[in-house]
């Protein structure tokens, strides 16, 4: 089978985008996605994203396979790339166009902005510990500033779901974290029955933070949109951050707002095409 694809990246978090509008099942299997994402023997990417027909009243449906073949509920950087890909498939739209996209995390609405930016209504954060899910829990039934033993050290963590689970911890120097060593220990900790994405945050000032991430199913990546959203929520809950905050990631910056008016998280960041091609499976 010859497969046409388009490669996109959002802050260096890169994806293979497939036009899957003609059928409701993904064009490739998780095993094939692993091959496509291989950076030595495949195209190379953090995941494969499928633009499927809409369901539940949505314009489109998004599914994604990670580079290890697992399927996350949603991906913040990925949905910005998908919005730009859909715009390309439809022949281009003026800035301000909004799409409704059905995901395993619910309905997400990205809006095209100028200068290749996309603003995404990410919905409300999930804070109830059992819904994230995590076995960590405070007296309010949330997991805010809770101790977690990892790699012989006690970390104070806050857990938030943006449709996918996140564990956030605040550190003095994010560059000093041996992410390649402890990332998997967090991901597979028994406190997280569905595994976890982990964000390490250095607060520069209340409206500016630095973040590094270990993504569930992908490992170290240059950016994570849902992680940036979850980190600002965690920062507000623990008194570290303002509700409007710039998040600096290795791949660039995202603007995150946790609106007090509607409790929704709004993420603004870039998405750009890298190249197009064909691959034989």
Curated annotation (Swiss-Prot):
<dbReference type="GO" id="GO:0009089">
    <property type="term" value="P:lysine biosynthetic process via diaminopimelate"/>
</dbReference>
<dbReference type="InterPro" id="IPR018510">
    <property type="entry name" value="DAP_epimerase_AS"/>
</dbReference>
<feature type="binding site">
    <location>
        <begin position="76"/>
        <end position="77"/>
    </location>
    <ligand>
        <name>substrate</name>
    </ligand>
</feature>
<feature type="binding site">
    <location>
        <begin position="215"/>
        <end position="216"/>
    </location>
    <ligand>
        <name>substrate</name>
    </ligand>
</feature>
<feature type="binding site">
    <location>
        <position position="66"/>
    </location>
    <ligand>
        <name>substrate</name>
    </ligand>
</feature>
<comment type="function">
    <text>Catalyzes the stereoinversion of LL-2,6-diaminopimelate (L,L-DAP) to meso-diaminopimelate (meso-DAP), a precursor of L-lysine and an essential component of the bacterial peptidoglycan.</text>
</comment>
<keyword id="KW-0963">Cytoplasm</keyword>
<feature type="binding site">
    <location>
        <position position="13"/>
    </location>
    <ligand>
        <name>substrate</name>
    </ligand>
</feature>
<dbReference type="InterPro" id="IPR001653">
    <property type="entry name" value="DAP_epimerase_DapF"/>
</dbReference>
<comment type="pathway">
    <text>Amino-acid biosynthesis; L-lysine biosynthesis via DAP pathway; DL-2,6-diaminopimelate from LL-2,6-diaminopimelate: step 1/1.</text>
</comment>
<comment type="similarity">
    <text>Belongs to the diaminopimelate epimerase family.</text>
</comment>
<dbReference type="GO" id="GO:0008837">
    <property type="term" value="F:diaminopimelate epimerase activity"/>
</dbReference>
<feature type="binding site">
    <location>
        <position position="197"/>
    </location>
    <ligand>
        <name>substrate</name>
    </ligand>
</feature>
<keyword id="KW-0457">Lysine biosynthesis</keyword>
<feature type="active site" description="Proton donor">
    <location>
        <position position="75"/>
    </location>
</feature>
<feature type="active site" description="Proton acceptor">
    <location>
        <position position="224"/>
    </location>
</feature>
<keyword id="KW-0028">Amino-acid biosynthesis</keyword>
<dbReference type="Pfam" id="PF01678">
    <property type="entry name" value="DAP_epimerase"/>
</dbReference>
<dbReference type="GO" id="GO:0005829">
    <property type="term" value="C:cytosol"/>
</dbReference>
<comment type="subunit">
    <text>Homodimer.</text>
</comment>
<keyword id="KW-0413">Isomerase</keyword>
<feature type="site" description="Could be important to modulate the pK values of the two catalytic cysteine residues">
    <location>
        <position position="166"/>
    </location>
</feature>
<feature type="site" description="Could be important to modulate the pK values of the two catalytic cysteine residues">
    <location>
        <position position="215"/>
    </location>
</feature>
<feature type="binding site">
    <location>
        <position position="164"/>
    </location>
    <ligand>
        <name>substrate</name>
    </ligand>
</feature>
<feature type="binding site">
    <location>
        <begin position="225"/>
        <end position="226"/>
    </location>
    <ligand>
        <name>substrate</name>
    </ligand>
</feature>
<protein>
    <recommendedName>
        <fullName>Diaminopimelate epimerase</fullName>
        <ecNumber>5.1.1.7</ecNumber>
    </recommendedName>
</protein>
């Amino acid at each position: 089978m010859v497969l046409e694809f388009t490669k996109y990246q959002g802050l260096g978090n890169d994806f293979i985008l497939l036009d899957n509008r003609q059928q409701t099942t993904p064009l490739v299997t998780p095993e094939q996605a692993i091959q496509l994402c291989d950076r030595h023997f495949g195209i190379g990417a953090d995941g494969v994203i499928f633009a499927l027909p809409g369901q539940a009243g949505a314009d489109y449906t998004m599914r994604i396979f990670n580079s290890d073949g697992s399927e996350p509920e949603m991906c913040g950087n990925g949905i910005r790339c998908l919005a730009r890909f859909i715009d390309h498939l439809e022949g281009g739209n003026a800035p301000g166009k909004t799409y409704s996209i059905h995901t395993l995390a619910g309905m997400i609405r990205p809006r095209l902005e100028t200068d290749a930016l996309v603003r995404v209504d990410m919905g409300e954060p999930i804070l109830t510990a059992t819904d994230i899910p995590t076995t960590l829990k405070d007296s309010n039934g949330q997991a805010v500033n809770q101790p977690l033993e990892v790699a012989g050290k006690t970390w104070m963590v806050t857990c938030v779901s943006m449709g996918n689970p996140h564990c956030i911890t605040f550190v003095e120097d994010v560059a000093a974290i041996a992410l390649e060593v402890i990332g998997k220990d967090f991901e597979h900790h028994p406190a997280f029955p569905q595994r976890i994405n982990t964000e390490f945050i250095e607060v520069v000032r209340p409206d500016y933070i630095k973040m590094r991430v270990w993504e569930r199913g992908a490992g170290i990546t240059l950016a994570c949109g849902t992680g940036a959203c979850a980190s600002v929520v965690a920062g507000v809950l623990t008194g570290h951050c303002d509700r409007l905050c710039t998040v600096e990631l290795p791949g660039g910056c995202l603007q995150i707002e946790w609106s007090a008016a509607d409790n929704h998280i709004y993420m603004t960041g870039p998405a750009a095409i890298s190249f197009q091609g064909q691959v034989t499976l």
